[in-house]
């Protein structure tokens, strides 16, 4: 090897080997590190190693370089070069050498979000951009003749005459073009449309001078079509608004129809105040012979003994029931629109009409319902209530003129067809006697009401009967239960003490 080096040195003469090595080392195929072989000019005693070297920009020198330069080269950051080979992806797509610092990551995050926010703002502004209607007049402008400056006056006059004809047809345009008269000068300028409609009319290219009226006709027809669409839309909006108004009126009507029912039902369960409860307790503890109230029109006196039948566990007597029937009629007279027109017989009516000894006797009760006494005929009422006392049990019979049926209500759900037969016969006789009319009730239905609150003890039958009458006279369903009987007893006592049913 040494002999070969001497021969090579003798053949090359003064050739600088450092230049040759630099050219070899700067070859593009080498990586960031290259192998330094032993030179042939006396440097073979140095051990081989990996030394960093540059790829480009190396300063070539014509002088031999000192041995220490290759062994201890200047450390400089090499320029990164794109790798043309498969690369292993590490740490979520980046190796350790290409990982960014926290500062760069934060800067990249803010920059990326800033760009994203700008794009979103731009997209939102573009999303709500309203496209204007474009009228294409290019197809019909092929035959347009341009009017030159030296156009004869006759041609201009002919154009003006045609404009007059078009103006007569343009009246349906509702004034969309306020400057049509400017066409008489011999040219049509689309830009001369009224500014009020410039936002809704856009031509896709500027048209300056047009002698043909096809463009004008197309623009005018477009305006007319748009006007008709607006009119149609206005009619639809008007129709919708009228429909909404109708629905509002109907809903208000329904509410007006429902609200009184809710108010009346609420009034049927108004609790007693502390003062009223105290007054009722004092009345229940009064002496037996102490007259608490007197109703002058009916001549009924309520003593302490009579009122105590309204205490829980007691049977109702005739005086309390009859006075309460009178109070219900007075309540109806105070507010006739709030309650049904009813007639309330007392507890002695049916025993007079049907006597166990003589049977049915209309003459016994004929004078009970005279016009002079009542001020109205029974046939003009909605309902007629007849309390029925059967030995030790109270029930209710109703002549329902409004619904044309005879009803029987028993808190034990009993049935008494004979009672309804007697009442049907009575009503026919009553109408014939007072109105001289033969009433046919053969088509009227007899109903033994089953859907009603039931009695669960042996003493509340009278209270159930009174509340049947109260709720039916209000036009309400029987929406109460046995548990509310103590409240109804106290309320009835309060109303009797006040001589006013509520």
From Swiss-Prot:
Main function: Protease that catalyzes two essential functions in the SUMO pathway: processing of full-length SUMOs to their mature forms and deconjugation of SUMO from targeted proteins. Cleaves precursors of SUM1 and SUM2, and very inefficiently of SUM3. Seems to be the only ULP1 able to cleave SUM3 precursors. Cleaves SUMO peptides better than SUMO-conjugated proteins.
Listed Gene3D superfamilies: Adenoviral Proteinase, Chain A
List of catalytic residues: 393, 410, 461
Domain notes: The N-terminal regulatory domain is required for peptidase activity in vitro.
GO cellular component: cytoplasm; plasmodesma
InterPro entries (alphabetical): Papain-like_cys_pep_sf, Peptidase_C48_C
Gene Ontology MF annotations: deSUMOylase activity
Keywords: Hydrolase, Protease, Thiol protease, Ubl conjugation pathway
Entry's EC annotation: 3.4.22.-
Family in the record: Belongs to the peptidase C48 family.
One of the GO biological process terms: protein desumoylation
Segments crossing the lipid bilayer: none
Protein's name according to its UniProt entry: Ubiquitin-like-specific protease 1A
One Pfam family cited in the UniProt record for this chain: Peptidase_C48
Organism: Arabidopsis thaliana (Mouse-ear cress)
């Amino acid at each position: 090897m040494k002999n070969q080096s001497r021969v090579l040195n003798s053949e090359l003469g003064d050739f600088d080997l450092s230049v040759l090595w630099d050219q070899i080392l700067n070859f593009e195929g080498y990586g960031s590190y290259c192998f330094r072989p032993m030179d042939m000019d006396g440097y073979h005693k140095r051990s081989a190693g990996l030394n960093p070297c540059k790829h480009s920009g190396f300063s070539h020198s014509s002088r031999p370089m000192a041995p220490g330069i290759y062994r201890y080269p200047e450390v400089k950051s090499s320029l990164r070069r794109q790798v043309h080979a498969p690369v292993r992806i590490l740490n979520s797509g980046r190796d350790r050498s290409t990982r960014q610092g926290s500062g760069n990551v934060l800067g990249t995050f803010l920059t990326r979000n800033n760009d994203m926010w700008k794009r979103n703002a731009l997209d939102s502004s573009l999303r709500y951009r309203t496209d204007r209607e474009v009228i294409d007049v290019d197809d019909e402008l092929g035959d347009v003749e341009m009017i030159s400056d030296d156009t004869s006056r006759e041609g201009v006059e002919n154009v003006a005459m045609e404009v007059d004809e078009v103006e007569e047809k343009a009246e349906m345009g509702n004034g969309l073009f306020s400057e049509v008269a400017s066409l008489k000068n011999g040219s049509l300028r689309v830009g001369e449309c009224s500014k009020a409609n410039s936002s809704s009319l856009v031509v896709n290219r500027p048209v300056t001078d047009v002698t043909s009226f096809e463009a004008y006709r197309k623009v005018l027809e477009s305006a007319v079509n748009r006007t008709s669409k607006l009119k149609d839309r206005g009619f639809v909006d008007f129709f919708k608004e009228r429909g909404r108004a109708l629905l509002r009126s109907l809903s208000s009507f329904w509410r007006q129809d429902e609200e009184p029912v809710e108010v009346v039902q609420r009034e049927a369960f108004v609790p007693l105040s502390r003062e009223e409860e105290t007054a009722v307790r004092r009345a229940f503890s009064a002496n037996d012979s102490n007259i608490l109230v007197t109703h002058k029109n009916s001549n009924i006196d309520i003593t302490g003994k009579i009122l105590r039948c309204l205490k829980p566990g007691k049977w109702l007597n005739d005086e309390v029931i009859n006075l309460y029937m009178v109070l219900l009629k007075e309540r109806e007279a105070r507010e006739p629109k709030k309650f049904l027109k009813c007639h309330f017989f007392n507890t002695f009516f049916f025993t007079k009409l049907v006597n166990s000894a003589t049977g049915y006797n209309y003459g016994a009760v004929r004078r009970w319902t005279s016009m002079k006494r009542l001020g109205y005929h029974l046939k003009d009422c909605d309902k007629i209530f007849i309390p029925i006392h059967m030995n030790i049990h109270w029930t209710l019979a109703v002549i329902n003129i409004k619904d044309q049926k005879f009803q029987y209500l028993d808190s034990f759900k009993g049935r008494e067809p004979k009672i309804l037969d007697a009442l049907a016969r009575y009503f026919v006789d009553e109408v014939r006697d007072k109105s001289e009319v033969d009433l046919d009730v053969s088509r009227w239905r007899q109903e033994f009401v089953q859907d009603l609150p039931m009695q669960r003890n042996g003493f509340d039958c009278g209270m159930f009967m009174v509340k049947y009458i109260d709720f039916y006279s209000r036009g309400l369903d029987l929406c109460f239960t046995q548990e509310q009987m103590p409240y109804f007893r106290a309320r009835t006592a309060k109303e009797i003490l006040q001589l006013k049913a509520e």
